[in-house]
Structure formats: structure tokens, C-alpha cells
Amino acid sequence: MNPDLSRLRPYPFERLARLLEDASPPDLEAINLAIGEPRHAAPEHVAARLAAHLGGLSRYPTTRGEPALRAALAAWASRRYGLVPELDPERHVLPLNGSREGLFAFAQCVIDRSARPLVLMPNPFYQIYEGAALLAGAEPWYVNPADPETPAPDFEAVPESVWKRCRLLYLCTPGNPTGTVFEPPLLQRLIERAHEYDFVIASDECYSEIYPDEARPPPGLLQAAAAMGLDDYRRCMVF
């Protein structure tokens, strides 16, 4: 048995469910802000296409995903973030069953538990970041906001001694639950530190397409790296 299992804390959604068991607002309809899932039905044209292809679901998919899917993902991300040259679907893209499995497995791949590693993450954070760090034998290090009125994590307050032990930095942009968007100058400073202190950035961008202004989509880590001329995206992983 992995002894690090004892370090895990209860999953927040389980705790939240227990807290809400007896909560019943008298004259108000409750708004569930717990798990981020759609509150409306799937679009009919999407459901129809899925149903039309159910006959092909009797076999396991390829490990790397279908070539057509990887090509479509690479083309979309290249358009979305203005990446030149475009992403290579053979080198840069791997489909996952949601971001959680990748965010967890990535930590197990890049962390050497013998080196007293730290995994940095914004606070508040998605629980999987902490769990992945603990089960990889690392210590989580929480990057707090500068003050309660400013939800952005204060990376300038991170001591150099912490950066030196950092092996993985989790980001979430746009952030959950704060909504914080990391702008390119900050992302580029973090990329520079990743190269200086020999760690990797895992940017959780699952909310990248939820934003109020169609003219200003949130920037991303790959976009920031490309603007620096780092078109190999070394030390940058996006989920």
C-alpha cells in the first residue's frame, strides 16, 4: 500500500454534500455551485452525431487517439492562440478522458520523490493538484493571494528557496473558483522561472472558452511561450 495515501484529505465535494444535507432554504430555489457540470441538455445536433456513431464503440481506441482527432485539436488550438508554426498533432497533442487523469498522471511522471520536491499551486485550488503532489511524494506549496480582495496568486512572494525545490507548478487560468485570468506577462515570467529553476508548468485551462467578451478570449500558456520564441513549448504542458 502506498503510505502517501494516508496524507490525502477528504474530497471537497464529499464534504460539501455532507454540509448541505440538511440545508433547505425556506422560499428560495437552491443554486448548485458545487460540481461544474452543464445545467442544460446536450445540443441536439451533437447528441444525434454521437448516436449515429455508437456502432463504432465496440473496440478500444488507439492509445494516442485517432489521428483525425489529434489533427483537429492541433488545428483548433493553433487558431485559438495564434500559434506559428502550428502545433504538430504527432508531437504536441494527446487526447484524454477529461483533464483530471492527465493532471494527476503528469505529476507522477515529472517528480523525483528522492529530491525533497515541492509542487506549487494557486490557493484556492482544484483538489487533484494537491492529491497528485502527495501521491508523487512531493510537498504541496500553496501560493496565496496578496490580499483577500485580490484573488490572483502572488508569485512574487514565493521565496527563492521554494523556487529552487519546485519541480512542478500547477496553474489554473481562467481560475476556479476565483475567475482569475493570467495575462501573458505573468505567464512569461513563470516560463522564465521554469527554465531558470528547472521545473515544469502544468496549466489547467479547461475554462478557456468561458468568458464574457467575445473580442477578448483569455490568453494561454502556449500563446505566451510562442510570443517568447519558444515554439518547442519546452517546460509547458496545457490541459
Predicted regions and their residues:
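N-terminal small-domain helix-loop-helix segment of the aminotransferase-like
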Residues: 2-101, 105
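Short, intrinsically disordered, charge-balanced linker/junction segments flanking boundaries
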Residues: 19, 161, 229, 234-239
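Helix C-cap/helix->beta junction micro-motif
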Residues: 26, 136, 196-197
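Catalytic-core regions built around general acid/base machinery
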Residues: 49, 189-196
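Conserved core of the PLP fold type I
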Residues: 57-192, 208-230
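A short helix->loop->beta-strand "cap" motif at the edges of active sites that frequently abuts
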Residues: 117, 196-199, 233-234
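Short, Asp-centered acidic motifs that coordinate Mg2+ and/or phosphate
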Residues: 168, 200, 237
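Walker B catalytic acidic pair
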Residues: 205
